[in-house]
Design a protein with these regions (language model features):
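Short beta-strand/loop motif that positions the catalytic acidic residue
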Residues: 258, 264-266
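Active-site loop/oxyanion-hole signature of alpha/beta-hydrolase fold enzymes
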Residues: 51-53, 88-137
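Conserved HGGG/HGGXW glycine-rich cap/lid loop of the alpha/beta-hydrolase fold
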Residues: 46, 53-98
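Alpha/beta-hydrolase fold catalytic core
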Residues: 1-59, 81-84, 109, 113, ...
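Flexible "cap/lid" loop of the alpha/beta hydrolase fold
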Residues: 159-191
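Conserved alpha/beta-hydrolase catalytic His-Asp/Glu region
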Residues: 29, 173-174, 194-257
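Conserved hydrolase catalytic core segment
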Residues: 132-171
Length: 323
């Protein structure tokens, strides 16, 4: 009996070690293939990755879940840098930004950065970069961080939620977030996914995010999904999403306090962040908020319909007196 127990223990240790070794190897490869494209700045001991380009009024771009600044530098930012000073920021735990402090990042925990915590950290980073009265655009999860920015601070020109999370949703999230956002999944499942996730899995995931449109050619190679498959990033992402809803409930009750222009852009075929649950309610919650509805468009309008998103940015700039 003892020999059997020892044998099982040795097998478990070997398997665990193999998984961790393979995950670490893939993380090193991801870091080499997709290094920081901007600068690493320190905010109260937290490293924040920021990329600055262009000239004009300040425009901050916040990526969504599983993303990083490369989502915007694929093509979108180039369309704007001739008339805006663009500040791209990796959200906590994703890309090359650290978790927001020592209270986060535990393997066997569900500690996560709320939208308000993220907004405060990224606002401090933007301040270091000299941002003045910025427009804050947030895609998907970045949308709720942009709205938190407006609730936490009043020195911004306006908010552009793009397919942005804004209101509480019914039902449960999918298994990926419920499992990996739990303490046991964070510790046990994340390393396995990090070690063995295939390119087919990545391709299928990206395709589902863009549906019903198709991802642009070259997008996957540029954006670097391997960065998100790192154990630390997977944990940060899953926990932030899995435990997001209570924060959205709290924030949505305060939207009436937002007194800056809000111009949302949302596709009516978005099944990830549905229009009717999220952006469609904003005009009743925020005085003067507008929503541009894109018929037949899914979750990635800044790639599939960039002109509509740029027009929303320009409307905020005009309403705020920046143009």
């Amino acid at each position: 009996m003892k020999n059997a127990i020892y044998t099982v223990a040795i097998i478990v240790i070997l398997l665990t070690g193999t998984v961790q070794y393979l995950a670490a190897k893939r993380e090193r490869q991801a870091a080499a293939a997709y290094p920081p494209t901007g600068q690493l700045i320190e905010v109260d001991g937290v490293t924040v990755h920021a990329e600055v380009m262009g000239d004009g009024p300040d425009l901050i771009l916040l990526h969504g879940a599983s993303g990083n600044t490369r989502d915007f530098t694929f093509q979108f930012a180039d369309r704007l840098k001739d008339r805006y000073r663009i500040i791209l920021l990796d959200r906590p735990g994703l890309g090359w930004t650290d978790r927001a402090g020592p209270d986060y990042g535990g393997v066997w925990s569900t500690d996560h950065e709320s939208p308000r915590v993220q907004a405060r950290l990224l606002k401090a980073a933007a301040d270091q970069l000299g941002a003045e009265n910025p427009i804050v655009l947030g895609h998907s999860f970045g949308g709720i961080v942009a709205l938190a920015w407006a609730l936490e601070h009043d020195d911004l020109a306006g908010v552009v939620p793009v397919a942005g999370v804004a209101n509480p949703w019914p039902g449960e999230l999918g298994w990926y977030y419920r499992v990996n956002g739990a303490a046991w999944g964070s510790a046990l499942v994340v390393p396995v996914l990090s070690a063995f996730a295939s390119q087919d899995y990545v391709n299928a995931t990206v395709a589902s995010i863009f549906e019903p449109q198709a991802a642009p050619e070259g997008y996957i190679d540029h954006v670097g999904p391997a960065l998100t498959l790192r154990r630390g990033s997977m944990r940060a992402n899953a926990k932030q999403v899995n435990w997001l809803r209570p924060h959205v409930v709290e924030m949505s009750a305060e939207y009436g306090q937002i007194n800056v222009p809000v111009e949302a852009v949302h596709g009516d075929a978005d099944t990830i962040v549905p229009l009717d649950v999220h952006a469609a309610k904003l005009p009743d919650q925020i005085d003067g908020a507008n929503v541009t509805v894109l018929p037949g468009v899914g979750h990635m309008p800044h790639h599939t319909h960039p002109d509509d998103v740029i027009a929303a940015i320009d409307r905020v700039a005009a309403r705020a007196g920046l143009r």
